[in-house]
């Protein structure tokens, strides 16, 4: 048995692993592990992206909050998310078309082979896969009801998904957007930058989820655009029985921010 360590901003996380299943170098360094207590684990460029144990706490909140805040989402784009978790959640809704845009085919191929958390989403006839930069995709793409940004940390190949131009393009291409916005506890500069750069979505809010394998477990998301939280119970009937974590009570509670975080958000929006 060996331990996998991830270090960030003066602290870290250790996870006992049984074995490394695969490692590949390309656009990014992709590693997949079998862990002692958290199932399979995906690591990109040294950063934990998911474990089987807690990935629903992330993917369900990233996807169902915007999807159930839209009256009738039919066309959805997932930017990033090559592991297939977000795509899996999107397809629980009655969508007509879902486009997955990821710059790194390795992530998709290795996730399909080793992780298999997509539960067949990659083979769904409603799905189209585009291997390209997310910002470049937005320049010429069609209009979507919802865009979901499931990116890695805002460095390296993902940094173009966090600048002001990205959000200016996205605002022209969707009704509602959601994105992960890092740890508001120890990644404050990233968090603040995302709040500021997402200003093309004049209406936007922050919400939270607990994701134990992410830095300090408290993880933030931003939703922007023309979202509507009424009729959550009625809309939840679309996916009732299909979620592990998400429900309307969790949805509403996620927007109850502690006072220190309210001040952070108000200072940036």
UniProtKB/Swiss-Prot annotation:
Cellular localization per UniProt: Cytoplasm
E.C. designation(s): 2.5.1.16
Active site (catalytic residues): 150
Presence of keyword Kinase: no
One Gene Ontology term from the biological process aspect of the record: spermidine biosynthetic process
Domain of life: Archaea
The PABS domain, residue ranges: 1-226
Subcellular location, principal: cytoplasm
Keyword terms of this UniProt record: Cytoplasm, Polyamine biosynthesis, Spermidine biosynthesis, Transferase
Reactions listed under catalytic activity: S-adenosyl 3-(methylsulfanyl)propylamine + putrescine = S-methyl-5'-thioadenosine + spermidine + H(+)
Pathway note: Amine and polyamine biosynthesis; spermidine biosynthesis; spermidine from putrescine: step 1/1
GO cellular component: cytosol
Subunit description: Homodimer or homotetramer.
Name of the protein in question: Polyamine aminopropyltransferase
Species, as recorded: Archaeoglobus fulgidus (strain ATCC 49558 / DSM 4304 / JCM 9628 / NBRC 100126 / VC-16)
Encoding gene per record: speE
């Amino acid at each position: 048995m060996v331990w996998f360590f991830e270090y960030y901003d003066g602290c870290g996380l250790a996870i006992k692993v049984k074995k490394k299943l695969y490692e590949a170098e390309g656009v990014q360094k992709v590693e997949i592990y079998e862990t002692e207590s958290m199932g399979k684990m995906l690591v990109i460029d040294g950063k934990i992206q998911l474990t089987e144990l807690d990935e629903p706490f992330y993917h369900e909140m990233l996807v169902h909050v915007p999807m159930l805040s839209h009256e009738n989402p039919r066309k959805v784009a997932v930017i990033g998310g090559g592991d297939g978790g977000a795509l899996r959640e999107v397809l629980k809704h009655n969508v007509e078309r879902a486009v997955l845009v990821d710059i790194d085919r390795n992530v998709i191929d290795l996730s399909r082979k080793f992780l298999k958390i997509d539960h067949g989403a990659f083979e769904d006839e409603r799905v189209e896969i585009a291997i390209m930069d997310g910002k470049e995709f937005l320049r010429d793409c069609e209009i979507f009801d919802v865009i979901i940004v499931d990116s890695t940390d805002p460095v390296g190949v993902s940094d173009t998904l966090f600048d002001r131009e990205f959000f200016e393009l996205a605002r022209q291409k969707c009704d509602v957007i959601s994105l992960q916005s890092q740890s508001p506890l120890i990644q404050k500069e990233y968090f603040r930058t995302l709040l500021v750069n997402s200003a093309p979505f004049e209406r936007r809010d922050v919400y939270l989820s607990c994701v134990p394998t992410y830095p300090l477990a408290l993880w933030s998301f931003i939703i922007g655009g023309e979202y509507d939280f009424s009729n959550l119970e009625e809309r939840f009937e679309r996916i009732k029985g299909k979620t592990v974590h998400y429900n309307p009570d969790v949805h509403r509670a996620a927007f109850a921010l502690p006072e220190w975080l309210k001040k952070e958000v108000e200072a940036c929006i």
